[in-house]
Amino acid sequence: MATPPPLRRVAALLLLLVAAASTPTARADLVVTRADRKVDLTSHIVRVLTSLKVENSGPEAVSQFLLAFPNVQAKNLAAIRAFGTEEKVKGPSMVLPIEVVQPSGVPPELTFFSASLSKPLEKGKTLHLDVLTVFTHSVQPFPEEITQAESQLVVYQDSAQYLSPYPVKVQTLSIRLPGGRVESYTKYPNTKLAESELKYGPYEDLPPFSYSPMVVHYENNNPFAVAKEVIREIEISHWGNVQITEHYNIAHGGAKLKGEFSRIDYQSRPYIRGVSSFRHLIARLPPRAHSIYYRDEIGNISTSHLWSDSKKTQLEVEPRFPLFGGWQTTFTIGYGLPLQDFVFNSDGKRFLNITFGSPVEEILIEKLIVKVVLPEGSKDIDISVPFPTKQEQEVKYSHLDISGRPVVVLEKLDVIPEHNLYFQVYYRFNNISLLREPMMLITGFFLLFMACIVYMRTDMSISKNSPSYLAKVQWDEVQSIIQQIQAIFNQCLAAHDKLETSLHELSRSGDVKSCKVARKTADAQFKELAKELKPLLTSLQSSSQSYQIWPKVEELVAKERELQDKLMTRHSTVVDSFEKKLRGQDVENRIAAQQQKVAALRQEVESLLEYISEI
């Protein structure tokens, strides 16, 4: 079997801890008489609950308690909370403020937090302290790649002894595992593995900065749901609704899939041929959530399930495909909430009171962006969040907005379920602003109806005596004349084609008589068309609207007459040649120049006709 990752950094840390333990400091005034740690490894998010009993053995009162973590562990610390109460004092535990500190004379490979006590701990007094720490990326898949049929094995590294700057009289460690097999674990005296629980200790009389490296290599097939980014938009409408839209980009953060994926094997035996994958996520929505939808880039996803009662609304999100290690998917969840359940009034202000994180269970969000869209006209905006976040403000424009809607943007990294706490956004909003958009709609429809009435009752026609009307009439007349002229010239071109056809028939049959009849018919048609064209040209020339088109028409007439002459001349030459019984080559030589001229003129006439038709 492969060996878990080396512990070189842990060994180096041990040397520093030994040096730190030999440094006398004022921290020796406190003694941890008992330390009980409970580590929950059932998920990919590690939760450690440390119960401490602390005694002040020094001569002076102490107002703070130091918590120490190795840097390699502190960099993955997502949340830390401390609760304390003095012995023999009745009442609930007090939440203690915690901040990062750097005491003098300690190794830089350690990160220290200071818990400020609610009141100084006097000499000889005892304090009960509960510390909850939550770590991300502390459970690593090993091996890093597995096949579809293999279970997922992970490794967790910690210390079997409680790392503290104070001496510890008695300490125990209990590690809760998800079940399944345990490949290996570090064994020390008083180590016991019973079913899904691994215990170390009790260990007594430990000096400050005691550290015993411990590694657990075990099976964990629970969903390693890691969201690369989640954008959560909360839009407030004072017409009675809070609309929430959440965009997810989720990946499986466990061991990557090695080899090919077989859907047939997965569907036939999903709990054997896909034990390390996850096919659904659970989102716990507020009780009165409504208008719930779940979709991705393709569209609505129908493979979701919804349950609701008076206490909660549960949505089971099932992607289109199961997620194995390294795979990812994107989807969107949207739902509405009653306004009166989440927006309240206080001291002349309104405030939104809603949870910060995602409703999806056991999900790690590497980057969460929460956008609170306030109604247009909101001002005096204040934000209260129970933990540090990056805060910005922007403006969003929607339907009928004039100045835009203020948007509060909150951004936080490494968000876990413990961050799903309530936060508040305070703002001032005048109820009169509610009427702005309805009044805009009413005014718009009123103006539209008034415009329709005015339009229906107003004579919009152009006067027959106005210059524009007269110009339009004249232009219509010009267009009518142009259409008639085009029709005449099209007839001329048709007559040209008949002459060409008669020559082809002559070369085929040698019928000179029929060819002469065709020429005579064409000549008569040309004369008739010229008579029809003459009055049209006169009318066109006299119109004031034809100044642009008349030069082209005049050029067209000249080219057409020249084309007719050339056609008739060529026709006569060919007929005479046939009557004289000349050879075909001699005929071609006689009409070659005429043929080129006829083709060029025909092209010019057609171009002029096309130009006139476009005008």
Swiss-Prot record:
Record topology, Cytoplasmic segments: 456-615
InterPro entries in UniProt: Ribophorin_I
One record GO biological process: protein N-linked glycosylation via asparagine
Source species, domain of life: Eukaryota
All ranges on the Lumenal side of the membrane: 29-437
Glycosylated residues (UniProt): 300, 353, 431
GO CC annotation, single: oligosaccharyltransferase complex
Endpoints of the signal sequence: 1-28
Quaternary structure and partners: Component of the oligosaccharyltransferase (OST) complex.
Function summary: Subunit of the oligosaccharyl transferase (OST) complex that catalyzes the initial transfer of a defined glycan (Glc(3)Man(9)GlcNAc(2) in eukaryotes) from the lipid carrier dolichol-pyrophosphate to an asparagine residue within an Asn-X-Ser/Thr consensus motif in nascent polypeptide chains, the first step in protein N-glycosylation. N-glycosylation occurs cotranslationally and the complex associates with the Sec61 complex at the channel-forming translocon complex that mediates protein translocation across the endoplasmic reticulum (ER). All subunits are required for a maximal enzyme activity.
Protein name (Swiss-Prot/TrEMBL): Dolichyl-diphosphooligosaccharide--protein glycosyltransferase subunit 1A
Source organism of the structure: Oryza sativa subsp. japonica (Rice)
Annotated gene: OST1A
